[in-house]
Amino acid sequence: MAKRFSAMKDFARCKKPRLDVSVTRGSARPSPPRNNFDGILWDDDDDVILMATQLAEAEIEAEERKKKGGTEVDIGNSEVTFSEFAPTFQGSTSTQQMFPPPPPPQKKPTSLDMDAIFADDDDFDFLAVTLMDSEPQKMPEPKTSTSRITTSSISVQQKTTTTTTINATQSRQQEHQLKFLMDRIEALKRENAQLEKNLGDSKERNEIKSGEVSLLRDELKHLRQQLQASKMEKLALADETNRDCNKKVAEAAKQIAAKDIELKIKNAEFSKLKTQQKAHERSMNSSMSILQAAPDPLEKRLSLRLNRLNIHRSVPGLKTDNGSVFEYSENEDQTKKRRNHFELELKQLLLHYARLQAKPESVDNLLPRILSSVGKVFTEFASYAQSLDFPHNCMLYPYNPHNLEEEVHRISLTHQSCLYDNEKAVPLRRFIATLALICRREERISRGLTEWKENDLGLLDMAIEAITKLGFSYEVGQHFGLLEALTSLLNSLLQENALLQHNEELLFDLLKQLVFTRPSPWVFAELSSCFLSCLRHPQLMDKMCVNSPKDCFVSDRVRSVYRFGPDSCLLQVYAGLLELCFFSETPLRQDYFQLLLKIGGNHVRFAFECFKNPPDFILEMLPYFADDGDEDSSDGTLMKTGTSLSFNSTGAVQGSVSNGSTSASVSNPNQNSNSSTTQRGKGCECYVKLCLSAVTIVFQVMHQWMLHSRKAGTEEVGEISRIAVHLLSLVFHEYYLTCLFRDSEETTKHYLSLICNWWSEHANLLGFQSIHLRLLNQLVKAHFMLKPLHLEAKPNNPVNDLSEWKRIVKNADDQRAVKSAVTVDPSKLLNTDFFSALKREENTFE
């Protein structure tokens, strides 16, 4: 209804713009009557006629529409008033369409336009609709004429208010627009000023950069010119240097060719002289063997002090007519070929080791390849050992001194640099060290290594043969790295829990030959670990001592010399060499001190385990393990421990001279107590050397610890000391034997005295507990340390000792052919100053 009314209103306004028709929503009160003419008497006649005509036409039209029964516009509640004619339409309607605000009222014209008023009849529709809607209502009573006046005044007030509001609104809008435009202009001015400033700065920077670029281009051009000039100078200098070098190379080549010819001539002459010398020595040896009688055992033992004499026993792996020492050494091509072979096999083994680490399950595929490679290398190793330089009579192992003052750089056995000065066979050492790592990782490979055969020869057999030849060589000192790698390989093979009898023999022979090479202290570190591993295999421990005769050993305490032969006991040789390994009165270097701690710890543990689970050669010596059926065993033991040192020492000396004949008579009271007398009569001193070497090693460890101001290795020294106090208590208190002080008596007593004093002084620092202190107290109160060394020894002992050894060596150096067969009277030895200087005045041999 509102939209329809709005359309009709717009149409009426367009047709008659000058007629002001106000249509408002009717209120609840009844609208005033439409036909009230009282309020319009003051209008003109034309207006009255017009309004009457409009009312009449509206009534007629309302009746017609009523008859039709349709009502299109409901204006029953609306009120239509005609206040006055105005330029534009003024009114308020309720519509949903938004219209612009009405324009301000215009000035009324001075004259009425009747044509415009009566031009169109459409405006009468509004009156007809109004009359039709309002007809059913009851006509109200006529009011006074003041209603028209009130309506006119309200309309005028509304117009005035609307005009004022519109003017104020337009004024405010204009002010806002003007203010907005001014602000916008100011912002644009500021932005323009900033842009002009930035433009100026950019221009300045561009000018500066352009200048810098020009300078850099000039410098670059200048440097390029200098570079080109320097290149030309270098090319000229290089050409000149090449010409000079070519001249010098040509001259050097001529000199080398001349030297090669001269060297070949000298080598030929030298080879000829060696061949003649060999023939001459053979003839001399044959003539001497015819005239010389069988040597006496004593003379045979004394002869071991000379390098040119031997024990008259051939080595199974060497031929007496081996003339390799008199032949010209292999040329450089053969040496290079062998080195390349070792390097090639080393690369293959490293590749196999890497695959084994990546895929441990591939050991089945890699096992034959690794063993085949090892067979080739060991075959070449045996050939290499044959080419070394060694003496003709290979009966006596040489002495290989080692300098404890030189600086060493120990990284790893597999490192490619040299571990020793003038080291040889470095690729072979690296190959064997890598093989040791593989065997330690895979037990199947170590087992296969002992069973694999190459050309009907076992791998370990070839290694033993090569090490035997290497031990007699003059170049053994240059192969200490190789020996250390072989010892590491042996230690890996000994880790196997169950060893076959054949494999035990091979491993023992390999261990023996490695010890007999008199290696460096670094090799002894691995050897001490091997001896610890042997404790798990009783069969190997039984092979340590073979009861070798006395003439297989020579021990010189004054000169620190220890000589032995191929038939010597392994344990005695190992213990004797270990005593001489770290003899030093000055502080060792830190690396050598740590090495001493490692070797000392391993050896003390080995000796202590030997007494905890004693093998046969120790059981035969211990007095508490004699025959159980002998009732006098305890008495014999007490008698033996209570016998004076001079009596037992006399028997020991006589036994060493007369090959046991006098020893049987002197030691007769103790034959029923234990079997040690029989053992000593046979000449083996494995038990004595094992005990004395433990004392010496412990003394060296404590002595070096004191020299290092008790700041380095305290934990290791404490652990060694706690084990050693148990060991020394067993050796010198529980199972004490007088034979321990037969040789080097005062030296051993001196070592023991110093060890006990150091332990007592630093017991807390070494971690001694009550059991250790009790055992230490027993050692201090033992009968072998009745007086300090400076009160017990005679002042002339060192002089007599040295003079006696000089006399023995001087007599041994004499060439005696027939006189050597004369037997020496043992009784004359009792009058010598050497033995009388070993005891106190009241216990002399006289």
Swiss-Prot record:
User: Coiled coil: which residue ranges?
Assistant: 168-240, 327-359
User: Which InterPro entries does the UniProt entry name for this protein?
Assistant: ATRIP
What does the record say mutating D244N does? Answer: In strain: NC350
Impact when changing P109H: In strain: MW38
UniProt superkingdom: Eukaryota
Query: What is known to happen upon mutating A28T?
Result: In strain: MW56, NC335, NC336, NC362, NC740 and NC774
- Say yes or no: keyword DNA repair present: yes
Q: What mutagenesis or variant effect is reported for P549H?
A: In strain: MW27
Give me any GO biological process, just one.
regulation of syncytial blastoderm mitotic cell cycle
Outcome of mutating S803T: In strain: MW6
Here the segments flagged for biased composition (Low complexity) are 144-162, 655-676
Result when mutating L499I? In strain: MW63 and NC306
Ranges for region Disordered:
20-40, 90-109, 135-162, 651-681
Gene Ontology cellular-component terms for this entry are:
cytoplasm
What tissues has this protein been observed in? Highly expressed in the oocyte and nurse cells from stage 5 onward and in embryos prior to during nuclear division 14. Then, it decreases to background levels during interphase 14. Weakly or not expressed in stage embryos and imaginal disks.
Q: According to its UniProt record, which protein family does this protein belong to?
A: Belongs to the ATRIP family.
Oligomer and partners: Interacts with ATR/mei-41.
The written remark on domains in the entry is:
The EEXXXDDL motif is required for the interaction with ATR/mei-41.
Return the protein name: ATR-interacting protein mus304
Upper lineage: Eukaryota, Metazoa, Ecdysozoa, Arthropoda, Hexapoda
Protein's gene: mus304
